[in-house]
């Protein structure tokens, strides 16, 4: 069995964003750090994998929407780097904790 490490980041969006835009940000992180990323809109309980075909749908996140980003990595080091990168990339949209 392979060990995996996971964490969840939660925040409220300060401005409008599409799921595909959020997916691009997450994909940017994933190119540098191998991790699995799942996006959750807490208001609608909508789950999205940034690499799925769901991003072709015109789904949007609005200012004030609560989001959760679940990160899964194979090491604690990779997970820590992924958390830092996601927070850095999304700092203009939300404060994740």
PLM regions: where:
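Short, Lys/Arg-enriched, disordered terminal segments
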Residues: 1-5, 96-97
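Short glycine-/aliphatic-rich beta-strand segments at the starts of folded cytosolic domains
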Residues: 3-13
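Short glycine-enriched loop/turn motifs at secondary-structure junctions
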Residues: 5, 40-42, 64-65
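Short, glycine/charged-rich beta-strand-loop motifs at protein surfaces that mediate ligand recognition
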Residues: 12-14, 41-43
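Amphipathic alpha-helical interaction surfaces in cytosolic regulatory modules
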Residues: 16-36, 46-65, 79-87
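Conserved short beta-strand edge segments in small beta-sheet-based binding/regulatory domains
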Residues: 36-39, 92-97
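Amphipathic, charged alpha-helical scaffolds that flank and support histidine-based chemistry
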Residues: 43, 67-85, 97
């Amino acid at each position: 069995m392979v060990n995996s490490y996971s964490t969840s980041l939660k925040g409220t969006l300060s401005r409008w964003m599409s799921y595909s835009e959020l997916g691009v940000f997450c994909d940017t992180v994933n190119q540098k750090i191998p991790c699995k990323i799942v996006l959750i809109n807490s208001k609608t309980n909508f789950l999205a994998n940034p690499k799925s075909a769901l991003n072709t749908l015109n789904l949007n996140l609005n200012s004030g929407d609560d989001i959760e980003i679940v990160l899964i990595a194979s090491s604690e080091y990779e997970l820590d780097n992924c958390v830092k990168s996601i927070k850095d990339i999304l700092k203009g949209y939300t404060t994740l904790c």
